[in-house]
Curated annotation (Swiss-Prot):
GO terms for biological process: blood coagulation; inflammatory response; vasodilation. The gene is Kng1. The lineage of its organism: Eukaryota, Metazoa, Chordata, Craniata, Vertebrata. Kininogens are inhibitors of thiol proteases. HMW-kininogen plays an important role in blood coagulation by helping to position optimally prekallikrein and factor XI next to factor XII; HMW-kininogen inhibits the thrombin- and plasmin-induced aggregation of thrombocytes. LMW-kininogen inhibits the aggregation of thrombocytes. LMW-kininogen is in contrast to HMW-kininogen not involved in blood clotting. This is Kininogen-1. Its main location: secreted. It comes from Mus musculus. InterPro entries: Cystatin_dom, Cystatin_sf, Kininogen, Kininogen-type_cystatin_dom, Kininogen_Fetuin_HRG, Prot_inh_cystat_CS. One of its GO terms (molecular function) is cysteine-type endopeptidase inhibitor activity. One of its GO terms (cellular component) is extracellular region. Residues 434-471, 492-526 have a biased composition (Basic residues). Glycans are attached at residues 82, 168, 204, 242. The modification Phosphoserine is found at residue 331.
Length: 661
């Protein structure tokens, strides 16, 4: 039993040790990186026995590992300064030495930071004297302090003594054990001096029960931890003659039990693909199909979660999604395994409770399901369309296209006019019927076109055939609709003014609303000109109608109107839904947009004056914006010298246009 406990605790400790923060790249110009480099350089310069101090040139790469403590790993370039190593000046107070005489180097360091205090973990610098091969900065020598491997066997007695000293001289309730050796240095004197930095962690062994560490003591994942630095002197007889230690403890989370308490009657999770669930799922889907009156069988598609609990038997709780199949209950007595799921069939979200007592062959399934919401996705081709904002609303007769916005005042005005008499309907809708012989001399025009607000004309009067400047009549034929009712109703846009005389009699009525007014009386004889004009106007193209629309707006008349002013009602066209239902392909969708009441809003829209050949927006550059890289960083101090090994060539006659041509 102790062996199993030890293995479980050791595996938990191993998992804890392997879970660390990932290193992330940082900006080489970051202030925190500079502080770490400054600390490293100040630790390096005192080791220079002769010559001058070294100064920071730039940081070329760096990473950061968050945690407690935070670790910075970086590479930086150094150059020899003009201050002596024994001058006592900070390297920031020096200047670079001449390029031909200055030595350069590259340092790789790892620096930790805890509570705004830095400490060196590792640092190695390689110095290259001017015009000389790269040499190591540190040379092995007898009597010098040098780093040793953290896995060296020589450290075992030192670390053992250090841990025992900490446990015996602290008032903590639990024993601590070694977690990791971070650095170790050794110096040969009349014996050996050791300088080590290591971390410790709390174990599950209390001092009341265990006087010292033993094999059953394991580290707690959420226990207290600390960092220590020890200095030990071992004489020539390998006996510890002197020892000093300084530690900093950090409290962890609340202590947890090494092993969870057993709970035989508690629910436990089961893998959704466990073979144990095969029989349980079979009982669940059979119960669902028996209780459901759907004409087709359902089949389990996805198992989301499953638990089991030991009671007076076994209780299973399963969450799954069932989908409709192609197998009908009329042609199949039971659900077969080869029944295919219907692609557009109904889906159910189900919760099943299955109670099983195998020794009694007793199975009690209970299944509760609810239908999943099916969202109808409108089919449309990809790409941008200005009609995406037009929404489609369901009605009893079909689908109606609703504009994205309707002014409130316009809605109220339309509601009032819908109750009054009307003479027609439609947007730019034209009704034309061949003339009755008994009404050859009369022509009635009704204008109910919903034009843009500044294009509406309001008029009532007699119109004369086009000629002699007495008026003109425009007939739009690209939205023509015929209805046979015995009368000749032609929707036109007409503006007439002045007085004229002729040999016949004709009259026309034009109704519209807007800012234009038309008035006047005219008499004319209906001759073959009328027939020819009708034929000609029916053959006009859409572009001609469009150009006439704009010309009409420039000929708006002002004056007194004769007859009542009628506001045509706003009609809602109905578009029958077909196999391909998409608002992008609804014909005349532009015409479905109701007129805006700009009269009430003109004062709210400011006048924007745009200079010629100017843009009201910024163009997107053809080239990507230049982003400064994180590394290498900027030179700490602009050097007035140039590297003699680097050749610099200036191109005074280079032009970017030469490369683009």
């Amino acid at each position: 039993m102790k062996l199993i406990t030890t293995l479980l605790l050791c595996s938990g400790l191993l998992l804890t040790l392997t879970q660390g923060e990932e290193a992330q790249e940082i900006d080489c110009n970051d202030e925190a990186v500079f502080q770490a480099v400054d600390f490293s350089l100040k630790q390096f310069n005192p080791g220079v026995k002769s010559g001058n101090q070294y100064m920071l040139h730039r940081v070329i790469e760096g990473t950061k590992t968050d945690g407690s403590p935070t670790f910075y790993s970086f590479k930086y370039l150094i150059k020899e300064g003009n201050c002596s190593a024994q001058s006592g000046l900070a390297w920031q107070d020096c200047d670079f030495k001449d390029a031909e005489e200055a030595a350069t180097g590259e340092c790789t360091a790892t620096v930790g930071k805890r509570e705004n205090e830095f400490f060196i973990v590792t640092q190695t610098c390689k110095i290259a004297p001017s015009k000389a091969p790269i040499l190591k900065a540190y040379f092995p020598c007898i009597g010098c302090v040098h780093a040793i491997s953290t896995d060296s066997p020589d450290l075992e007695p030192v670390l053992k003594h250090s841990i025992e000293h900490f446990n015996n001289n602290t008032d903590h309730s639990h024993l601590f054990t070694l977690r990791k050796v971070k650095s170790a240095h050794r110096q040969v004197v009349a014996g050996l001096n050791f300088d080590i930095t290591y971390t410790i962690v709390q174990t599950n062994c209390s001092k009341e029960r265990f006087p010292s560490l033993h094999g059953d003591c394991v580290a707690l994942p959420n226990g207290d931890d600390g960092e220590c630095r020890g200095n030990l002197f071992m004489d020539i007889n390998n006996k510890i003659a002197n020892f000093s230690q300084s530690c900093t403890l950090y409290s962890g989370d609340d202590l947890v039990e090494a092993l969870p308490k057993p709970c035989p009657g508690c629910p436990r999770d089961i893998p959704v693909d466990s073979p144990e669930l095969k029989e349980v799922l079979g009982h669940s889907i059979a119960q669902l199909n028996a209780e459901n009156d759907h004409p087709f069988y359902y089949k389990i598609d996805t198992v989301k979660k499953a638990t089991s609990q030991v009671v007076a038997g076994t209780k299973y709780v399963i969450e799954f999604i069932a989908r409709e199949t192609k197998c009908s209950k009329e042609s199949n007595t039971e659900l077969a395994e080869d029944c295919e799921i219907k692609h557009l069939g109904q889906s159910l979200d189900c919760n099943a409770n299955v109670y099983m007592r195998p020794w009694e062959n007793k199975v009690v399934p209970t299944v509760k399901c609810q239908a999943l919401d099916m969202t109808e996705m409108a089919r449309r081709p990809p790409g941008f369309s200005p009609f995406r904002s037009v929404t489609v609303q369901e009605t009893k007769e079909g689908r109606t296209v609703s504009p994205p916005y309707i002014a409130r005042e316009q809605e109220e005005r339309d509601a009032e006019t819908e109750q009054g008499p009307t003479h027609g309907h439609g947007w730019l809708h034209e009704k034309q019927i061949k003339a009755n012989k008994n009404h050859r001399g009369h022509k009635h025009g009704h204008d109910h076109g919903h034009w843009s607000p500044r294009r509406h004309g309001l008029g009532h009067g007699h119109q004369k055939p086009h000629g002699l400047g007495h008026g003109h009549q425009l007939k739009l034929d690209y939205l023509r609709h015929q209805r046979e009712d015995g009368d000749d109703h032609t929707h036109t846009v007409g503006h007439g003014h002045g007085h004229g005389h002729g040999h016949g009699h004709g009259h026309g009525h034009g109704h519209g609303h807007g800012h234009g007014h038309g008035h006047g009386h005219g008499h004319g004889k209906h001759t073959n000109k009328d027939k020819n004009s009708v034929k000609q106007t029916t053959q006009r193209t859409e572009s001609l109608a469009s150009s006439s629309e704009y010309s009409t707006t420039s000929t708006q008349m002002q004056g007194r109107t004769e007859g009542p002013t009628l506001t045509p009602p706003r009609a809602q066209p109905t578009v029958t839904s077909s196999g391909f239902q998409d608002s992008d392909f609804i014909e005349d969708v532009v015409a479905t947009t109701p007129p805006y009441d700009t009269g009430a809003h003109d004062d709210l829209i400011p006048d924007i004056h745009v200079q010629p050949d100017s843009l009201s927006f910024k163009l997107i550059s053809d080239f990507p914006e230049a982003t400064s890289p994180k590394c290498p960083g900027r030179p700490w101090k602009p050097a007035s010298w140039e590297d003699p090994n680097t050749e610099t060539t200036e191109f005074s006659d280079f032009d970017l246009l030469d490369a683009l041509s």
